Amino acid sequence: MKMEEAVGKVEELIESAAPPKASEQETAKEEDGSVELESQVQKDGVADSTVLSSMPCLLMELRRDSSESQLASTESDKPTTGRVYESDSSNHCMLSPSSSGHLADSDTLSSVEENEPSQAETTVEGDTSGVSGATVGRKSRRSRSESETSTMAAKKNRQSSDKQNGRVTKVKGHRSQKHKERIRLLRQKREAAARKKYNLLQDSSTSDSDLTCDSSTSSSDDDDEVSGSSKTITAEIPGRGCFLN
């Protein structure tokens, strides 16, 4: 829009410069006649050619900018980028001093337009960095939750294995009457077996005591018999000695 307005202003300036020249031609006609009219027309043509020769660079640049703006408006899907002007030594319009002053506005506009996409790129990079940080935070949370669940599962497995090894079993649900009767019968059988073992141990201990008593009495009787026989022997020997004497 700015470039189109500039083109309109240039055309208005050219049109405003044309009427005084026409008035000058009319005065020349009144004063000098037809010969002077032809000379004035030639002079006007030369002046117009000089003006146009000094202005073509600006017109070319304005037309180029207007065409580029139209292309940018038609291709709205594509991202806007700054204009890059090629500087060639053969392009006398870009190097001419007359066009340098008029092109200052276009240069500033191009620099502004170049800065805008750079700012947009920086904002996009900031957004991507924020998104990447958010994704990293989510991944860390997921990894923490997964590690916690794995540790909890490992603890449960260890507890269950310890209980199984230690024969610690919990009965789930309500026990039936038959199950209770079976448990009671098993307890009675265990108690009866324990009593039998205790009685057998007591019987074995009593029999051992009886055997020890019998052995002690028999040993005492044997000692008495041995001592009595020895006495008789000793008594008989002196009598024999006396008899021998």
From Swiss-Prot:
Primary location recorded for the protein, binned into one broad class: nucleus
Region (Required for interaction with CSNK2B) location: 202-226
GO CC, any one term: nucleus
Chain positions with Phosphoserine modification: S66, S67, S143, S145, S147
Nucleotide-binding recorded as keyword: no
InterPro entries on file: RNF111_N, ZNRF3_Arkadia_E3_ligases
Bias type Basic residues, positions: 169-187
Region (Disordered): 1-245
Subcellular location: Nucleus
Annotated coiled-coil segments of the chain: 175-200
Known tissue expression: Detected in brain, liver, lung, kidney, heart, spleen, skeletal muscle and spinal cord.
Compositional bias ranges of the Low complexity kind: 203-219
Keyword set includes Metal-binding: no
Function per UniProt: AMPK substrate important for exercise capacity and skeletal muscle function. Required for normal contraction-induced signaling.
Protein name (Swiss-Prot/TrEMBL): Protein ARK2N
Protein source organism: Mus musculus (Mouse)
Lineage: Eukaryota, Metazoa, Chordata, Craniata, Vertebrata
